[in-house]
Swiss-Prot record:
The enzyme's E.C. designation: 2.4.1.68
Function statement: Catalyzes the addition of fucose in alpha 1-6 linkage to the first GlcNAc residue, next to the peptide chains in N-glycans. The addition is prevented if the GlcNAc residue is already fucosylated. Involved in susceptibility to the nematotoxic C.cinerea galectin Cgl2, likely by contributing to the synthesis of core alpha-1,6-fucosylated N-glycans to which Cgl2 binds.
Glycan attachment residues as annotated in the record: 27, 134
Upper taxonomic lineage: Eukaryota, Metazoa, Ecdysozoa, Nematoda, Chromadorea
Any one of the GO CC terms: Golgi cisterna membrane
Species the sequence originates in: Caenorhabditis elegans
SUPFAM superfamilies registered for this protein in UniProt: SH3-domain
Listed name of the protein: Alpha-(1,6)-fucosyltransferase
PROSITE patterns: GT23, SH3
Length: 559
């Protein structure tokens, strides 16, 4: 792995120097040359900082391996005893060391590998956003794509993904079993219960995220969750929750609640039955809200998955969206129309109706396709062979699929204009629309990569639903706007790992160890946030921080 990281570092240096040279060469006037030189000097300084970090990582890992090798050699008696301390106890046999490896090493390796991937991506975003000569930009981006493909191969070369897949699957099953035990008590009428109202005034993705909030709250407070009147009164379907999903519990609403008056949720609460309002109305946010991760799983998930909070939320959504047999049959039929077995497919979720212009900006198909093509080029480098271009489009605009087929003839385009029609505002709250949005989310969770806007709840659901599958899909997306979030979540914070001195009045200073409340990634090498120590808000280089995942001890989690 050291050789691979060193090779990646070398390519990064070569690419950046080519970029710097091109910047100087393309600025001829005196004023432009001075500005270019200043920009170049700043870039060189940043590059030197990154190089020192890379050298530090390499040296640290090299030292750890040397220490481990020395210890093994000593334990196997291949090194003479220390004459200055002959009273040292007899060392344990080598097999004891090998059978009890420290968890710290693998965790550090996984974290460092992801840090490397993140830095490469952020550097690509920086290059991609530059206004430089087109031929130079193409050359630089081609080299960066090659670099990302090389980095993606590290996982395959290490040869341990199969074991990590099993471990992630085991964690999913552990959470599932814990939810099932809490949801199915021995005595329904005696169980502590949380009542959730399904009909929040919003769309399907928003409603399912509300039920997810209810489920996580119930799990954190060790209560069974039931839908009010079993979800029989649902704006999306006159047939209720069970028209598409399985029951959430063996206990019905009448069995669990009956004539008991549900008290407003509070924690702690002595009431057996409580009713939960919407997350938007909270004044004080409980510490168990997303993006909190179970304290008992944080170390394992940090090693095994690139986005532990999305994994945890996704497991709850997977439990909630357990389809009944009729729905599963329809989904299986829809999935068969998408040739997933023929090669990779990128899923595009394109929102065009109610939220555009209010919650989200309009994004043309060209923007989605630009990042789709970049992913295919990286994947070709990773696999070492050319790939057929295939996309699946989920949209509330029936004109998008024909537009893609017309404008991108080198792509095989899949998607339903009929489903898009049911997503129109005048058709939205119908059984056909419900089945359509479920189908889109389900297929989006099965594709190889997502390009969408995370301001869309449907997009985030497709991303969340794919996380507990066993694979590490935490970074297999590109959002055209927001970073991942859960509506009503606790503040998303990051920790500074490299000092930063503001270069202009838009940037903020950072010191190692500072906490920053993250507001978003600008996808140009910079993120925006508020330094919790200085209370200054502004932008900073994204690579200088890492996520500081929140943790909460979920007592309901089984051992």
């Amino acid at each position: 792995m050291l050789k691979c990281i060193a090779a990646v570092g070398t390519v990064v240096w070569m690419t950046m120097f080519l970029f710097l040279y091109s910047q100087l060469s393309n600025n001829q006037s005196g004023g432009d040359s001075i500005r270019a030189w200043r920009q170049t000097k700043e870039a060189i300084d940043k590059l030197q900082e990154q190089n020192e970090d890379l050298k530090s990582i390499l040296e640290k890992e090299r030292q750890e391996r040397n220490d481990q090798h020395k210890k093994i050699m000593e334990q196997s008696h291949q090194l003479p005893p220390n004459p200055e301390n002959p009273s040292l106890p007899k060392p344990e046999p080598v097999k004891e060391i090998i059978s009890k490896p420290s968890i710290l090493g693998p965790v550090q390796q996984e974290v460092q590998k992801r840090m490397l991937d993140d830095r490469i991506r952020e550097m690509f975003y920086l290059l991609h956003s530059q206004t430089i000569e087109n031929s130079t930009k193409i050359l630089l981006e081609t080299q960066m794509i090659s670099l990302m493909g090389l980095s993606a191969q590290l996982e395959k070369l290490e040869g341990s993904e199969e074991e990590r897949f099993k471990q992630r699957t085991a964690i999913t099953q552990r959470i599932f079993k814990s939810i099932e035990k809490l949801q199915n008590p021995k005595a329904c009428s005696e169980a502590k219960t949380l009542v959730c109202n399904l009909d929040k005034e919003c769309g399907f993705g928003c409603q399912l995220h509300h039920v997810t909030y209810c489920a996580i709250t119930a799990f954190a407070t060790q209560r069974m969750m039931v839908l009010k009147r079993d979800g029989s009164s649902w704006k999306y379907s006159s047939h209720g929750w069970t028209s598409v999903f399985k029951k959430l519990s063996k206990c019905s609403f009448d069995e669990a609640v009956g004539n008991t008056e549900a008290k407003p949720f509070a924690e702690p609460s002595p009431a057996r039955v409580v009713s939960l309002g919407i997350v938007d109305s909270l004044i004080t946010k409980p510490t168990f809200l997303p993006q909190a991760v179970p304290e008992q799983l944080l170390e394992s998930l940090t090693s095994l998955h690139s986005h532990p909070p999305a994994f945890f939320v996704g497991t709850f959504i997977s439990y909630l969206m357990r389809f009944n047999s009729a729905t599963q049959e329809k989904l299986d039929k829809a999935l068969k129309s998408i040739p997933l077995d023929k090669g990779p497919i990128v899923g595009l979720q394109i929102r065009r109706t109610d939220k555009v212009g209010t919650e989200a900006a309009f994004h043309a198909l060209k923007e989605y396709m630009e990042w789709t093509e970049i992913w295919f080029k990286v994947e070709e480098k990773r696999q070492g062979k050319p790939l057929e271009r295939r996309i699946f489009i989920a949209s509330d605009d029936p004109t998008v699929v024909p537009e893609a087929k017309n404008d991108y003839p080198n792509y095989e385009v899949y998607g339903s204009t009929e489903i898009a029609k049911t997503a129109q505002l005048n058709n939205r709250y119908t059984d056909a629309s419900l089945m359509g949005v479920i189908t889109d989310i389900y297929i989006l969770s099965k594709v190889n990569y997502l390009v969408c806007t995370f301001s869309s709840q449907v997009c985030r659901m497709g991303y969340e639903l794919r996380q507990p599958s066993g694979a590490d899909d935490g970074s297999k997306f590109h959002s055209l706007d927001d970073i991942y979030y859960f509506g009503g979540q606790q503040a998303h914070e990051v920790i500074v790992i490299e000092d930063h001195i503001a270069q202009n009045n838009k940037e903020i200073d950072l010191k190692v160890g500072d906490k920053v409340g993250i507001a978003g990634n600008h996808w140009n090498g910079y993120s925006k946030g508020t330094n919790r120590q200085t209370y200054k808000e502004g932008v900073f280089p994204s690579y200088k921080v890492v996520n500081d995942w929140r943790k909460f001890k979920f007592e309901a989690l089984l051992d």
